Amino acid sequence: MKIIKGKKCDWEMIIGLEVHAQVISNSKLFSGASAKTYDSLPNTQVSLFDVAMPGMLPLLNQYCISQAVKTGLALSCKINNYSAFDRKNYFYPDLPSGYQITQFYYPIATDGKVVLEESNDKEVRITRIHLEQDAGKSIHEYGKTYVDFNRAGVALMEIVSEPDLRSTDEVAEYLKKLRMILRFIGTCDGDMEKGSFRCDANVSVRPLGSDKLGIRSEIKNLNSIRYVVQAIEYEANKQVMALENGEELIQNTLLFDVILGETRVIRNKEDAHDYRYFPDPDLFSLEIDDQYISEVKLSLPELPMQKRDRYIRDFKLNKYDADILVADRDVAAYFEEVVQKHDAKLAASWIVCDLFARLNKLGISINESAVKAGDMIQLLDLIVDKTISGKIAKQVFAIMFESGKSPISIVNEYGLKQLDDSDSVSMIVENVLENNKDKVLQYKQGKEKLFGYFVGQVMKETQGKANPELVNSIIKEKLQE
């Protein structure tokens, strides 16, 4: 809980979130038009139904139902055997029919939860998950408004939480956790920049210790977690200031101005009766039987929290590494391929530290990396069988990442095989000790830290190729003579 210090009393935030998650599907919710619209030219992925041409009827995409059921199960929801679609009536230029098909009365899933482990295992209740159409997109340029209907009719899952959140830290954790789950089960790509994971935040404040809910404002269409946090912080503090000045709050719908960092009113908040909901007469209700729910449940992959716990339990990974590896489904798959051949801690170290450092620097995903799982396995093979040292492996990896070449070919091309010949290493050690007689004497007089100096000089002479264990062994032997 985050307390807002007021002049008259302390206040707490009451926050509920409505997340609009675009369903991963080839086609739209009620038409055959492509749902892959982000990079398309305006109004090129549009059917007659999407733009409300007279006589066009909706045809339900059953795959979207499966995706919504899968999401509900992953969020511990009750999947309702009966579900139905309704019309939400309002006028806006990017909504050509004058209504949105949604699920107001009978949503597809209810009573779920998301557990926030970093907030003392707090449970944030999921009120409902329902399917609905996305609207088109209004583009305002040069004093004119243009409408792109590509997005109109794309399937959305609206995931509504109870007002259980009490700080922006909890909000950020909730959104990250929810997005991770949806990505992992393959129902939403969670790309906020592209608008496929958007958030409306309902914000109110009340005196600390009160159980009465205050007048809330809804901040619409927030498309980054950073903006969600900034908008909520600003709005909550604005409400506290108004209440302490004796002002009466009005239920409003707001937008967040990311340049000014402040919220502004776009309209008074509507209630349900303002939208005149009624059952859509063109669509049958849904009967979702238990057998179907069981089949969808069987298709669920291992969830990230379960996978993380398994990594910690079975592979003895620390929580930090395990959390990173399960944050993305493709990263987890990469790790699991490597760990079939190599020690889990060794694999995790190379993926989390070395591979991720380079991926993050370039801002690319693991699927775009030149170092595939098979290449990583080969590199670790060379380390384990002592063909190369760990230090040389870093050089090999850097070349792999830049060139896409295999580690074996790089080792051969650059002559990087580890020097394992004891006679050759012994000669180099003798030369190093001969050239540093004063330091040898100091070592024998008790300055044992110089041992590392001798090792470093040998490695320098061999350009890092000498087997470190062999070098250590021979130096110890020579110093005892």
UniProtKB/Swiss-Prot annotation:
SMART domains: GatB_Yqey. InterPro entries: Asn/Gln-tRNA_amidoTrfase_suB/E, Asn/Gln-tRNA_Trfase_suB/E_cat, Asn/Gln_amidotransferase, Asn/Gln_tRNA_amidoTrase-B-like, GatB, GatB_C_1, GatB_Yqey_C_2, Gln-tRNA_amidoTrfase_suB_CS. Its EC number is 6.3.5.-. GO terms for molecular function: asparaginyl-tRNA synthase (glutamine-hydrolyzing) activity; ATP binding; glutaminyl-tRNA synthase (glutamine-hydrolyzing) activity. It catalyses: L-glutamyl-tRNA(Gln) + L-glutamine + ATP + H2O = L-glutaminyl-tRNA(Gln) + L-glutamate + ADP + phosphate + H(+); L-aspartyl-tRNA(Asn) + L-glutamine + ATP + H2O = L-asparaginyl-tRNA(Asn) + L-glutamate + ADP + phosphate + 2 H(+). SUPFAM superfamilies: GatB/YqeY motif, Glutamine synthetase/guanido kinase. HAMAP family: GatB. This is Aspartyl/glutamyl-tRNA(Asn/Gln) amidotransferase subunit B. The gene is gatB.
